[in-house]
Amino acid sequence: MLPTPSTSHVNFDNVYEPAEDSFLLIDTLSSPTEATFLTDRFSCRCSSPVLLEVGTGSGVVLGFATSWAKKIFGRRDILAFGTDVNRIACKATAQTARTTIAASDAPDESFSAIWGDTIMADLTTCIRPGEVDILIFNPPYVPTEDLPELSEGEYASEFERDSHLLALSYAGGDEGMETTNRLLDELPNILSLKRGVAYVLLCAQNKPKDVKARIRFWEGGWHAETVGDLGKKGGWEKLQIIRIWQDP
């Protein structure tokens, strides 16, 4: 079992703390089934794959995938990036990734990818079309009446700022799917043609069966399957990871 990155440097008053959803993503990516799928998919002598995590939070998932790239993807020349609307989370992710890479690399063997940066952005708005080969998304999936505004604006207090930043990490609006639907709408344009693959976390109230059925109707022959399942309640809701991809 590969070690999980340390996030002891992160202030969880204003950054999403790793929980069951984070660890389910880590377990899924490093599972023998997915490691084999990803290694086979990126085994060709092609350009270096680009890895992007959208909504990095503490950086525990991206740090894990970056530091153990050779074991997960079968190659080290992965270019790893992240985005988050929370500038504090962006800084935390960069530190998590750098620290984890340094800890995982041994003098005689290195498993880590090439660390790029974390960019403060709304989902994939800063990414050029067709550039992402592996996308990871742990969205704000909790059903809520409203979505918090993306703009940080002016805060009356530090508590108000922290509450707003944390709300951005969990509040998903109607059926918990408003932010996820925006990301799904972008996927066919953002992922690299025929090579791109996405891992998206959903909870039962997001209606994953309906989500997968909708993806399968996308033009271009898209697939969507559950590849990771907590198998029990994750906090207050059952969680699963769906893989989204096209045949090469």
State each model region's role:
Residues 78-81:
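Short beta-strand element of Class I
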Residues 156, 160, 181-194:
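A short glycine-rich, Lys/Arg-flanked "PGG" loop and its adjoining helix->strand segment in the class I
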Residues 195-201:
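Conserved beta-strand signature within the Rossmann-like core of class I S-adenosyl-L-methionine
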Residues 1-73, 83-92, 125-128, 226-248:
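SAM-dependent Rossmann-like transferase core, predominantly class I methyltransferases
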Residues 136-179:
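Mobile active-site "lid"/loop adjacent to the S-adenosyl-L-methionine
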Residues 91-130:
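S-adenosyl-L-methionine
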Residues 180-184, 205-216:
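Short alpha-helix
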Residues 48, 131-132, 195:
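Local beta-strand N-terminus motif with an aromatic residue
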